[in-house]
Curated annotation (Swiss-Prot):
Matches recorded under Pfam families: PSII_Ycf12 (PF05969)
Family of this protein: Belongs to the Psb30/Ycf12 family.
Protein name: Photosystem II reaction center protein Psb30
Entry function: A core subunit of photosystem II (PSII), probably helps stabilize the reaction center.
Annotated keywords: Chloroplast, Membrane, Photosynthesis, Photosystem II, Plastid, Thylakoid, Transmembrane, Transmembrane helix
Entry membrane topology: Single-pass membrane protein
Main location: plastid
NCBIfam families for the chain: PRK13686.1
Gene of this entry: psb30
Annotated TM spans: 5-25
GO terms under biological process: photosynthesis
Amino acid sequence: MNLEIVAQLTVLALIVVSGPLVIALLAVRKGNL
């Protein structure tokens, strides 16, 4: 595999994972407030 492909897959995975994480974080903060 090329380094570019690995980098793109890593960035894509980070975006896919960070989406729900940010939503969950906001939900938890609102719940605590």
